Amino acid sequence: MNDTYQPINCDDYDNLELACQHHLMLTLELKDGEKLQAKASDLVSRKNVEYLVVEAAGETRELRLDKITSFSHPEIGTVVVSES
């Protein structure tokens, strides 16, 4: 399996940035099939890999942006993440 980070589309990134600024509660679907509801907290970059920092069930998690299939919130609709 190729685990090289694939940057996501700029518009999708902008929507995640907006979600973090407003601490929106997102419904996320990950490429491994996991679904979760989590509050968007921050976007961070380490070693050229970008992560969405979320708070879910009292825990802080970092989700690799290229491992997110989609995210949704009533204010932004459903966004299916595409690679840039």
Swiss-Prot record:
GO terms of biological process kind: regulation of termination of DNA-templated transcription; transcription antitermination
A family per Pfam: ROF
InterPro entries: ROF (IPR009778), Rof-like_sf (IPR038626), Rof/RNase_P-like (IPR023534)
Function: Suppresses temperature-sensitive mutations in essential genes by modulating rho-dependent transcription termination.
NCBIfam families: PRK11625.1
Protein name, entry field: Protein rof
Species of origin: Escherichia coli (strain K12)
